[in-house]
Amino acid sequence: ASFAEAPPGNPKAGEKIFKTKCAQCHTVEKGAGHKQGPNLNGLFGRQSGTTAGYSYSAANKNMAVIWEESTLYDYLLNPXKYIPGTKMVFPGLXKPQERADLIAYLKESTA
């Protein structure tokens, strides 16, 4: 199912998901720097593999996807299938509600 069919996202629920499943490797605050994964500040509208100062896989750079709700929704279902060769080891979020919640949180927290 596509993002157009996704349930409405709850940013508060998304923040909990981020803290338990994403924050070990990612930051969202401007100027927070990179961890194992890149800082996600300014994520929406940015091309994959282009965050300054982070060493991306060739797969992530070559995919050249623009991160928006619809691309993140598909990516977060199964990152390794969406971008084969990505360094992101996260297996994905199978539940549409969890993906919608996380995207709602990321829209607020990375702007």
UniProtKB/Swiss-Prot annotation:
InterPro entries: Cyt_c-like_dom, Cyt_c-like_dom_sf, Cyt_c_1A/1B. It is found in: Mitochondrion intermembrane space. The keyword Iron applies. It comes from the Eukaryota. Keywords: Acetylation, Electron transport, Heme, Iron, Metal-binding, Mitochondrion, Respiratory chain, Transport. GO terms for cellular component: mitochondrial intermembrane space. Pfam families: Cytochrom_C. Its main location: mitochondrion. The keyword Nucleotide-binding does not apply. PANTHER family: CYTOCHROME C. Belongs to the cytochrome c family. Electron carrier protein. The oxidized form of the cytochrome c heme group can accept an electron from the heme group of the cytochrome c1 subunit of cytochrome reductase. Cytochrome c then transfers this electron to the cytochrome oxidase complex, the final protein carrier in the mitochondrial electron-transport chain. This is Cytochrome c. It comes from Arum maculatum (Cuckoo-pint).
